[in-house]
Amino acid sequence: MTKSELIERLVQKCHAVAAKDVENAVKEILDQMSFALESGKRIEVRGFGSFSLHYRQPRLGRNPKTGEQVKLDAKSVPHFKAGKELRERVDIYA
């Protein structure tokens, strides 16, 4: 599902709210989540999951085109861990 598809679905469910207001709300939520992660904070949405940053050590990589070794710097990457409720909802083998 894309951001625009999410906005469309929310507009269909919430007839009392203008489409532009829904779009602005979704954008603001995503902006606030991004700002929190930039600040090194953890985001927890109970029943859904949590977002945090994971540190990646510097390492040697390889250029796939030339095969040449390339030094990759350390970096932080976003990480999502699904909550128990979400894991149970998507578990088709349960």
UniProtKB/Swiss-Prot annotation:
Coiled coil: none annotated. GO terms for cellular component: chromosome; cytosol. GO terms for biological process: DNA recombination; regulation of DNA-templated transcription; regulation of translation. Keywords: DNA recombination, DNA-binding, Transcription, Transcription regulation, Translation regulation. One of its GO terms (molecular function) is DNA binding. InterPro entries: Hist_DNA-bd, Histone-like_DNA-bd_CS, IHF-like_DNA-bd_dom_sf, IHF_beta. This protein is one of the two subunits of integration host factor, a specific DNA-binding protein that functions in genetic recombination as well as in transcriptional and translational control. Belongs to the bacterial histone-like protein family. Heterodimer of an alpha and a beta chain. HAMAP family: IHF_beta (MF_00381). This is Integration host factor subunit beta. It comes from Pasteurella multocida (strain Pm70). The lineage of its organism: Bacteria, Pseudomonadati, Pseudomonadota, Gammaproteobacteria, Pasteurellales. The gene is ihfB.
